[in-house]
């Protein structure tokens, strides 16, 4: 009976359960370490072997979940054993303390590893989403009778978007278009109104010029400050000053042109008179010579005497040439 009591005692059962639990946790940790080493090796070539890396991650997560489930059962045993401390021996208490320390260490390691794996998993999920996102933008188009559901849904979405329907809003009427003004009207509106120089303003302009020393000395800025006209700019004064200078120069230039014309006309008249006088003197001399040579008669043609004298001289020259030519022919054998 005593031996049977020892076999059926709760202390022996709890001692064996605790030892079995510790061994299972240690085995799980060994497997986790091995899988993590393999995972570190595959991380260098994760693009070439993405499925293998995913399998290792799933296996590590599964073992860690199993270890957590094993560790969650230990507080219940500890509480139950603490109630029945007189039944347990010193060996059971030592095992419990050792198991508690080991559990704390394993829990810290598991927490650190879990954080590391969660970070890696989040990075992998981000990469997968980036790889899938460009593929989602490409519509699935199939030929024949077997059209994909994605293409039909995309078509429906496109039709709804083109019609202006959304899931959260009803179709709204189009907003009326605002009539736009033509471009030339806008330019005319933006263009500054031209300055109108009325007689009063021009009189003030002339007074300012006279006080400042004349149009050749005064500057547009000085004229504007002296006039004190609201809204008058330097450019407007400058343009009006240029026009005023041209207006002043026009009468002077016309007078100079008229004097030059008169002077030229007088010179031309004087030269013409001199020529006429010389011609008249020559004709009088010719007339006197002709009258002395020719017999006096009732008809006198002074105008033809000069021409006849010229013709006779030409005829004398031709006669002399012909006579010399005939003499040369006679001399030649």
UniProtKB/Swiss-Prot annotation:
One of its GO terms (cellular component) is nucleus. Residues 287-303 have a biased composition (Polar residues). The keyword Transcription regulation applies. InterPro entries: Homeodomain-like_sf, HRS1-like, Myb_dom, Myb_dom_plants, SANT/Myb. Pfam families: Myb_DNA-binding. Keywords: DNA-binding, Nucleus, Transcription, Transcription regulation. Residues 189-249 form the HTH myb-type domain. Residues 319-333 have a biased composition (Basic and acidic residues). Residues 274-333 are annotated as: Disordered. GO terms for biological process: regulation of DNA-templated transcription. Gene3D superfamilies: Homeodomain-like. It is found in: Nucleus. One of its GO terms (molecular function) is transcription cis-regulatory region binding. Residues 220-245 bind DNA. PANTHER family: HOMEODOMAIN-LIKE SUPERFAMILY PROTEIN-RELATED, MYB FAMILY TRANSCRIPTION FACTOR. Probable transcription factor involved in phosphate signaling in roots. This is Transcription factor HHO6. The lineage of its organism: Eukaryota, Viridiplantae, Streptophyta, Embryophyta, Tracheophyta.
């Amino acid at each position: 009976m005593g031996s049977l009591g020892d076999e059926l005692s709760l202390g022996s059962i709890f001692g064996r359960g605790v030892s079995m639990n510790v061994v299972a946790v240690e085995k799980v940790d060994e497997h986790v370490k091995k899988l993590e080493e393999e995972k570190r090796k595959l991380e260098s070539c994760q693009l070439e072997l993405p499925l293998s890396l995913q399998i290792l991650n799933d296996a590590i997560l599964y073992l860690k979940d199993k270890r957590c489930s094993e560790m969650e059962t230990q507080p219940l045993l500890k509480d139950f054993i603490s109630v029945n401390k007189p039944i347990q021996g010193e060996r059971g208490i030592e095992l419990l303390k050792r198991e508690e320390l080991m559990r704390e260490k394993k829990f810290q390691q598991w927490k650190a590893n879990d954080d590391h794996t969660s970070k890696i998993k989040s990075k992998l999920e981000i990469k997968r989403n980036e790889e899938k996102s460009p593929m989602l933008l490409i519509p699935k188009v199939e030929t024949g009778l077997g059209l994909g559901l994605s293409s039909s849904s995309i078509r429906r979405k496109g039709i709804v978007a083109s019609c202006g329907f959304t899931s959260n809003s009803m179709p709204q009427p189009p907003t009326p278009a605002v009539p736009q003004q033509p471009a030339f009207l806008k330019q005319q509106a933006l263009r500054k109104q031209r300055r109108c120089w009325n007689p009063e303003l021009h009189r003030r302009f002339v007074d300012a010029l006279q006080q400042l020393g004349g149009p050749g000395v005064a500057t547009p800025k000085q004229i504007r400050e002296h006039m004190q006209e609201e809204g008058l700019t330097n450019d407007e004064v400058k343009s009006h000053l240029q026009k005023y200078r041209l207006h002043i120069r026009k009468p002077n230039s016309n007078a100079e042109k008229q004097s030059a014309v008169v002077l030229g006309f007088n010179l031309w008249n004087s030269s013409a008179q001199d020529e006429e006088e010389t011609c008249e003197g020559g004709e009088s001399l010719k007339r006197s010579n002709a009258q002395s040579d020719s017999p006096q008669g009732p008809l006198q043609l002074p105008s033809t005497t000069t021409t006849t004298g010229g013709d006779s001289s030409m005829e004398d020259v031709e006669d002399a040439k012909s006579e010399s030519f005939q003499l040369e022919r006679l001399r030649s054998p």
